[in-house]
Amino acid sequence: MDEKCISKAVIRRLPRYYRYLGELLEDGVERISSNELSTKMRVTASQIRQDLNNFGGFGQQGYGYNVQYLYTEIGKILGLDRTHNMIIIGAGNLGQALANYVQFEKRGFKVVGIFDVNPVLKGISIRGNEILMMDELPQYLKDNDVQIAALTLPKNNAEETANLLVENGIKAIWNFAHLDLEVPEDVIVENVHLSESLMRLSYNLNCYVTEHKK
């Protein structure tokens, strides 16, 4: 099936499958049934089978799923069988935290550059990458093969910076700014609004507290 036809809900579950299957491999588990997967994933076994059937199924009736094979195949679907070079725009607390996160490289995401407008930060090294100034960005992108930019800027700077990234060939933006970016159709954006996640947590906590007061 063409992956463009697959629902966003399915795509958002794939990293969870991948993470859990990786944990199973670390524990030495070689095979697992859809029922066992459903318990951990908190979705029905039927839903798991439907999700995986979008990509060919991968299971065998009466056997379940080969954990190593399924882990490898989902990794390929997620594009984790290749290295993606990534730059970080904004070297504040969040940008530095992303730059220091070692798990990215284990998943094939290599941070190759960090940029900021603050001259005080220029030249500071984070895991081997010296912070560069934003006016160096266009030439850097011409000279280097970069697929992804993580945007960790204030809201008022994000749109202009996103336009600069697009103009210089970036096709995927991981956006942590507090707005939804408007980009051309051929540019992929993943918006990560941390405050919205916290508000959902607050809602669920409020529901829990209200329910247990009854």
Regions found by a protein language model. Name each.
Residues M1-E30:
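Extreme N-terminal segment that seeds HTH/winged-HTH DNA-binding domains in transcriptional regulators
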Residues A91-G92:
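Glycine-rich Rossmann-fold phosphate-binding loop(s) that bind the pyrophosphate
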Residues G95:
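N-terminal Rossmann-fold NAD(P) dinucleotide-binding loop
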Residues G22-E26, R127-K214:
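Phosphate-bearing ligand-interacting subdomains
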Residues E105-R127:
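NAD(P)-binding Rossmann-fold cofactor-contacting core
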